[in-house]
Amino acid sequence: MKENETLKQIVLKTLEESVNSLISSFPEVEKETFKIKIEYSRDEKFGDYSTSFALENSKLLKRNPIQVSKELVEILQKRTDLFEKVDFTPPGFVNFRISTSFLLNYIETSVLSGNYFPKVDLPLKINLEFVSANPTGPLNIVSARAAANGDTMASLLKAIGHNVDKEFYINDYGNQVFLLGVSTLVRIRELKGEEGTQQETTDDTPIEIILEKNILPAEGYRGEYIKDIASSLLKDPKKNVTIENLLKQKKYKELAELCAVWTIENNLIWQRKDLDAFGVEFDRYFSERTLHEADKVLSVMKDLEKSGKIFQEDGKKVFRSTEYGDDKDRVVVRDDGRPTYLLADIAYHKDKIERGYDKIYDIWGPDHHGYISRLSGAVQSLGYKKENFKVIISQQVNLLESGQKVKMSKRAGSFQTMSDLIGFLGKHGKDVGRYFFVMRSLDAPLDFDLDLAKDESDKNPVFYLQYAHARICSIFKEVGDQTSKEATAILEMSEERKRLLFWIARFPEEIFDSANAMEPHRVTNYLQSFAKAFTSFYLAKDNRLKDASKEVRLGLARICLAAKNVLAEGLKLIGVSAPERMEKEN
């Protein structure tokens, strides 16, 4: 057995060798044309793994799949060191049952030796950007989902040997940021006793009128947090003096720009505090403003023009994004010379490329799907390979309470924040929040059941896993933590014991496959199935360590230790704690 291989890789390699041996007697067949793959048996009674090789390749083989399967079984049955049983199921499936001795040896060299995760042959330098919420307010629930999944993806990729930088892009430039400053200024003037007006505005209302009459813009921010920020700015002696001076001089626009900077500073402090509470740390916070200040936004135009992907239309500079699947070509420089948001994004990704990343991954919100083709096209026009840039869309989150959706609205001020959610879930907010957000694939909407999340029984999937870990810890406290590899090898293998061994041995490949697919939800799916296998083992009478003979106890304890390691490491990857003691362990 080669170190750094998963059990699935070992079985697949053995199958490939057996197929090559089989078709060596078929000179008219080219082995390179074959599809050879294995999957987990859909029904455990048939085995641990299965392959439909004979069915999928019957035309190429020009032979009956039943006959091919039977011949393949004969070859595979010779590997008695690896397989306990290999058999055939019509109309052409070959099923594999891994031998107990092989499982035990594999577990010893992986889960019980600390070599949990196989490493990739070629480690990559990866940039993983996620959350990147506008600094115009607290982080919302969609950002929380991106945070949990992005952080878990980074952990998975690092676990298998990649070098990963986690990055947060700060959108601190542009009109929306200015409107944030205007919104804060309106609240400051109100707090100073200046009567504002409730006059309705539109997107076309001149900013001079909005500032002169102290009107909250139509696209402004109405949340209570804006009032809190305004109040805190007035309590700062230096800032208050600046505010007073600029108000007296009626330099409202200059003051609004300052308020935008100050408000963003406050919001970033809040956002980072929320992320810290959620166990998410970034390697880099990258400011969009720095790109503009370094003239990197307009200068990237030279690269795009060199690629021949820019044309002029009505005084505007337009990127040929339709060549990359976009529904229309996109303006990157307006007729007044101002860059669009797209050009800033292109400049940002050029900066990533120049930092030498082999792979660039972005996690975006649910309303950005149409943006992928234009940015991907721009990245390709800069000479970066299409396959090295990937955008993952984090779909919408629906909070459910008593089966009903809880509404969210950002600008109206009645939305649920990441901080609100963690607080609502109480002392277990971080663990429960992170786990629930990772439970479903990012490309599907998530119904976040608040009632289930608050439930501290084992109906809650987080507590189900944590109780399993705590049970094992309590077992060791009761009978001691001594184990024996030799005692495990001579244990009688009941169905529950053998099933648990296979689920333990699957841990490295589940993590390896989840990391390569960048699908964190596969980890939670595996852990739930694993915990069920452990619970069946735990409840079986012949697995009660305190009632067993010393030799049996030492063998069972070895299995429990491996199970404990799987639970602890699996939970750690998704940022969830593995407590040794909980109020309910039995």
Curated annotation (Swiss-Prot):
Gene Ontology biological-process annotations: arginyl-tRNA aminoacylation
Motif ('HIGH' region) on chain: 133-143
Entry EC number(s): 6.1.1.19
TM helices/strands, residue ranges: none
Substrates-to-products reaction catalysed: tRNA(Arg) + L-arginine + ATP = L-arginyl-tRNA(Arg) + AMP + diphosphate
Subcellular location, record wording: Cytoplasm
GO molecular function, one term: arginine-tRNA ligase activity
GO cellular component, one term: cytoplasm
Subcellular location, principal: cytoplasm
Top-level taxon of the source organism: Bacteria
Pfam families to which the protein is assigned, alphabetical: Arg_tRNA_synt_N (PF03485), DALR_1 (PF05746), tRNA-synt_1d (PF00750)
InterPro entries: Arg-tRNA-ligase (IPR001278), Arg-tRNA-synth_N (IPR005148), Arg-tRNA-synth_N_sf (IPR036695), ArgRS_core (IPR035684), DALR_anticod-bd (IPR008909), Rossmann-like_a/b/a_fold (IPR014729), tRNAsynth_Ia_anticodon-bd (IPR009080)
Record keywords: Aminoacyl-tRNA synthetase, ATP-binding, Cytoplasm, Ligase, Nucleotide-binding, Protein biosynthesis
Matches recorded under NCBIfam families: argS (TIGR00456)
Assembly behavior: Monomer.
Family: Belongs to the class-I aminoacyl-tRNA synthetase family.
Protein name (Swiss-Prot/TrEMBL): Arginine--tRNA ligase
Lineage, uppermost ranks: Bacteria, Pseudomonadati, Spirochaetota, Spirochaetia, Leptospirales
